[in-house]
């Protein structure tokens, strides 16, 4: 199902208690918002996942260390856009520390309680003095409902801010989970995300929160791809303010909370695909009949990342050969004569390499903004679902001049 962009004024958006947010321009970008704060009233149980890229950015290294040293208790996230502070050496690490320190000083925190994130151009030193100088404005404009301002401040090539939240009824009351995310290109996470910051007012221990975040991440942000590139700065973090009902390991509350967290993260992930650089189509790719779920995921991500598949999607060409060729190099086990391919409910390839399909009906499916490709490997019960988009001329236009 194609996700719908959340209206920040709508009752469909639920903001959890115990958080203050802000999004302003600090001067890294000429005019648009480029500095975001998410602050919890009290030390919050915090969990995070980070990029696995070996060229990880200074703020990723700093935030990993801070979260570990804190025992999973943090107070704030500070994030700038327009500059990644990646591949910047010792000076970049010092600038990341200064981001944390200036935030801590402005909001009466310890620097070790601040997660730091950055996104933008790689290899340029961060003008951290602009961030430090903007702290009074950040503080003056902060509030409990400024989630969409915060979402706007972390955008780079995004065309709209991404924010979403839900209520979840638990034993002991109702908890809220909300999040913001950014991402449009360089999207192919690997045990991490792009940038996503979530908050909940549930009461939950850091270790359990980390487990639930990792599980939700595996089927949301780790199940999307725009271009096959894993960023140097990917990070997803969630803070729990403890203002709401308690979530204990092994309880019904833990199951319900985990499902709600997964729904929020899935919506944010799908919004990233909708906003993929130059994208005109949103495609759900399902792989069934694999030997295992892991093999299904291998096949799904390989097909979803294939430039030939993605350009065929853009051109509305039912080139099933590209799909099975991509699956064939994925490492998943199958016999090609047992494969089948469907576009929505329309059979394109049947077992026995029977490709006697209706070009007209296939074109009708592919002309839609949203459709599903199902690839069955015919080997077992393993399955996986990922989301991707087409690859258009617009992607080249955006990325051919990103630094200019």
From Swiss-Prot:
Keywords: Acyltransferase, Amino-acid biosynthesis, Arginine biosynthesis, Autocatalytic cleavage, Cytoplasm, Multifunctional enzyme, Transferase. It is found in: Cytoplasm. Substrate binds at residues 156, 182, 193, 277, 399, 404. The record marks 119-120 as: Involved in the stabilization of negative charge on the oxyanion by the formation of the oxyanion hole. GO terms for cellular component: cytoplasm. It comes from the Bacteria. Pathway: Amino-acid biosynthesis; L-arginine biosynthesis; L-ornithine and N-acetyl-L-glutamate from L-glutamate and N(2)-acetyl-L-ornithine (cyclic): step 1/1; Amino-acid biosynthesis; L-arginine biosynthesis; N(2)-acetyl-L-ornithine from L-glutamate: step 1/4. Gene3D superfamilies: ArgJ beta chain, C-terminal domain (3.10.20.340), L-amino peptidase D-ALA esterase/amidase (3.60.70.12). Heterotetramer of two alpha and two beta chains. Belongs to the ArgJ family. HAMAP family: ArgJ. PANTHER family: ARGININE BIOSYNTHESIS BIFUNCTIONAL PROTEIN ARGJ (PTHR23100), ARGININE BIOSYNTHESIS BIFUNCTIONAL PROTEIN ARGJ, MITOCHONDRIAL (PTHR23100:SF0). This is Arginine biosynthesis bifunctional protein ArgJ. It comes from Chlorobaculum tepidum (strain ATCC 49652 / DSM 12025 / NBRC 103806 / TLS).
